[in-house]
């Protein structure tokens, strides 16, 4: 359902050989911050690279597995600038929204994040999210993954 023309799936062989261990370390750290200790195994289900260009976006969606993540490899300079929207508190060009529940008193349902190169964001697979388009020339390159968590019995 993506409005992005260039997504490349990374082979399981490459993933296992070069990326899986590092991602497992990052996921273990994320899980330990949540005080979860009975992890038996973390399996990276899949990983793909997304090349997003001017005007492209990824509509609201969620993932499979238990945890998902996005890492930012390249961002166009000035990606979040938008000359058409002066005096706006929230500028969404090229940003990512995480969406959960409904807006309620003292509770926001949308968390907007302005990515930076080298950011790695890990989140529950069911958390709805969207990547907004940007209106300048350049490439936003990221990778996304899904992971399954196996617990000790």
Placement of each model-derived feature along the sequence:
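Non-heme Fe(II)/2-oxoglutarate
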Residues: 1-38, 48, 55-58
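Short catalytic/ligand-binding loop motif for oxyanion handling, primarily in non-cytosolic enzymes
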Residues: 58-59, 130-131, 152
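Catalytic core of non-heme Fe(II) oxygenases with the double-stranded beta-helix
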Residues: 45-122, 139
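Double-stranded beta-helix
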Residues: 146-153
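Ligand-binding loop in jelly-roll beta-barrel domains
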Residues: 128-142
């Amino acid at each position: 359902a993506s409005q992005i023309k260039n997504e490349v799936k990374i082979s399981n062989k490459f993933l296992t050989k070069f990326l899986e261990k590092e991602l497992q370390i990052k996921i273990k750290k994320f899980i330990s911050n949540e005080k979860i200790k009975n992890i038996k195994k973390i399996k990276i289900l899949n990983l793909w690279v997304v090349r997003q260009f001017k005007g492209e976006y990824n509509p609201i969606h969620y993932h499979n597995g238990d945890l998902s993540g996005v890492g930012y490899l390249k961002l166009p300079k000035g990606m979040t600038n938008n000359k058409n929207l002066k005096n706006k508190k929230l500028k969404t060009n090229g940003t990512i929204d995480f969406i959960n529940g409904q807006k309620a008193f003292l509770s926001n349902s949308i968390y907007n994040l302005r990515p930076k190169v080298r950011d790695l964001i890990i989140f529950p697979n069911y958390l709805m999210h969207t990547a907004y388009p940007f209106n300048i020339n350049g490439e936003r390159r990221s990778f996304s993954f899904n992971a399954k968590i196996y617990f000790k019995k």
